[in-house]
Amino acid sequence: MNNIWWHTKGQGNVHLVLLHGWGLNAGVWRCIDEELSSHFTLHLVDLPGFGRSRGFGALSLADMAEVVLRQAPDKAIWLGWSLGGLVASQIALTHPERVQALVTVASSPCFSARDEWPGIKPDVLAGFQQQLSDDFQRTVERFLALQTMGTETARQDARALKKTVLALPMPEVDVLNGGLEILKTVDLRQPLQNVPMPFLRLYGYLDGLVPRKVVPMLDKLWPHSESYIFAKAAHAPFISHPDEFCHLLVALKQRV
């Protein structure tokens, strides 16, 4: 079985693993990795099939979590952004003893809209899957543009994301498709009611992919978790609000 690309920096006494979102790679954390590595032992990861983690096909969420866990420290704070939030959540569910705290960023336990549940319309996700086979670079770029829409620094933030994608070879179409399939089908709302570790959920008020309406619904469903909304952020608050973002993580570190 292949290993994934994994880079460790910093020498803090708490380990922090960062998992990126769909179509991207660990380069997305460039704006905060220096600051975080002064507080944590930081682990930057390319998810299987993305970035420098080549040689993987489409994986289920459970398989992706197991592949990532193989190279992970014994115990860490796990932070996942968007699709990465589902991977981190899956690890917290299956190996809670390895997770000091769970942090999800602009992530939903169920990305797809369902009855009485706000999310991305299933036909929009299916449309992205269809367009991947026609022109996948343009499809990925459209998805990135959606992530920063509405913020004061939208254009600049979208450029930062695009630069991250273009810095490395594009993932294979079946890997991208597999990631969208996870976003379309996975629902962890009920399982995550029972996670035993500290659980922090971070959101952008202007996020077009994870509607802010889910925040109070999850506050009620998961009373043991904490939520925080970045008032002027969209889907990538760590790019638009890096200082505020790092401050929240350093504060969490004091509590675990």
UniProtKB/Swiss-Prot annotation:
Sequence ranges assigned to domain AB hydrolase-1 in this UniProt record: 15-242
Compartments it resides in: Cytoplasm
Subcellular location, principal: cytoplasm
Pathway note: Cofactor biosynthesis; biotin biosynthesis
Matches recorded under InterPro entries: AB_hydrolase_1 (IPR000073), AB_hydrolase_fold (IPR029058), BioH (IPR010076), Carboxylesterase_BioH (IPR050228)
Pfam families to which the protein is assigned, alphabetical: Abhydrolase_1
UniProt-annotated binding residues for substrate: 22, 82-83, 143-147, 235
Entry EC no(s): 3.1.1.85
Covalent S-S links between cysteines: none
Keyword terms, alphabetized: Biotin biosynthesis, Cytoplasm, Hydrolase, Serine esterase
Enzymatic reactions: 6-carboxyhexanoyl-[ACP] methyl ester + H2O = 6-carboxyhexanoyl-[ACP] + methanol + H(+)
Enzyme class, first EC level, given as a word: hydrolase
Gene Ontology CC: one annotated term: cytoplasm
An example Gene Ontology molecular-function term: pimelyl-[acyl-carrier protein] methyl ester esterase activity
Family: Belongs to the AB hydrolase superfamily. Carboxylesterase BioH family.
Quaternary structure annotation from Swiss-Prot or TrEMBL: Monomer.
Record NCBIfam families: bioH, PRK10349.1
Protein name: Pimeloyl-[acyl-carrier protein] methyl ester esterase
Organism this protein belongs to: Escherichia coli O81 (strain ED1a)
